[in-house]
Amino acid sequence: YYIKRGDFDTAWDTFEQGMKTVLTVRDFTQIFDAYAETSENVISLMMEELEDEGDEANDNTDTKDRAQQEAEIDRRMQDFEALMERRPFLVNDVLLRRNQDDVQEWEKRVTLWGDNDEMVIATYKNALETINPRKATANLHQFYIHFAQFYEDGGSLGRTDPSAVERDVAAARQIFER
């Protein structure tokens, strides 16, 4: 509806809201694919319009309008790239919404963050606050062990600063004692 009216910002907001509320991967995939396809179409349409204006260019062409159009295309392309980069996290969000006590999905979330130590730690803490031990899937104990090992190893990058390693070992001991 919003796309046909040309109200793309409202359409994007609707897509985002849909992705944040669905409970099945199938529904998410349909919304995500429609969102991505629409974004691609809008970008290609804007690029074609810019090319057409460039072909018809004469001395009266307003360079400010062209610069604004190019900036809008760049912004939309950045948004599209960010959407593609967020996809694994969004799928993981759907699976965690479905079962917040799924230890394996929390482990996948930790893996998605890779070398971003702050987000890895935040994810571990969020998971441990969220997971109900009585409802947790198998290997909750492994999750605690992996968290402690993360600190023991000095994070994902393996710090070499001795004082930082000592603090991390102390944090690892606290986690093991839980």
Segments from the language model and where they lie:
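Polyampholytic low-complexity alpha-helical segments
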Residues: 1-178
